[in-house]
Amino acid sequence: MPRSKGRRKEKTANFAGIPRWVIDTPAYKSLDGSAIKLLVLLAYQYKGKNNGDLTITHSVLKEYFKSNTTMYRARDELYKKGFIDFNAYGGKSFDGRKMSSLYALTWASVDDFIKLKKNCYRLTHLAIGKEPTVYFVKGGHPNPKNTKQKKAQYKKDVKKANVKHEKN
């Protein structure tokens, strides 16, 4: 029988992964059921190189959430507890189209905004940085009042030792 030359015969299936150390945190254990569902759906959207380009809209997630209210309440809970962060706020683009807000998972590093395909006509972009912030380990999001405070908070958090996590 000839030896394999490193090619796979079958493609492996994609999966939605949340690291075990994230699930073991007290913040994850305190999440509502709809927030856990939304977090799994965001992990499903995350393909490894698009963190910061994840969307939460009812038109995309309507088969999972029956109402806007439940979905946006789950989004707010994930933000307050530090599992997601805003990468860009929604609104109008340069050519007048509606754009959805973009989100990033805080346990993974944020990918380059320039390379993300949904942002060709984006008016606002919050540079949240590339390093993972892992706010959920500390018990919640710091909730700065403006972009300048957000950047300062991010720089301070990345320097702290408790932001770095140990991968299993």
Regions found by a protein language model. Name each.
Residues 45-109:
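Winged helix-turn-helix DNA-binding recognition segment
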Residues 1-59, 63, 98, 110, ...:
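Short recognition helix of helix-turn-helix/winged-helix DNA-binding domains
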Residues 28, 63-65, 88, 131-139:
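Bulky hydrophobic/aromatic packing residues
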Residues 11, 24, 35, 42, ...:
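A general marker of short, structured functional hotspots
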Residues 21, 27, 34, 45, ...:
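A generic structural signal for solvent-exposed, polar alpha-helical segments
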Residues 17, 58, 67-70, 74-79, ...:
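Append "and, occasionally, other polyanion-binding protein interfaces
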Residues 1-10, 109-168:
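Charged low-complexity intrinsically disordered patches
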Residues 27, 57, 74, 119-122:
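Terminal low-complexity, poorly structured segments
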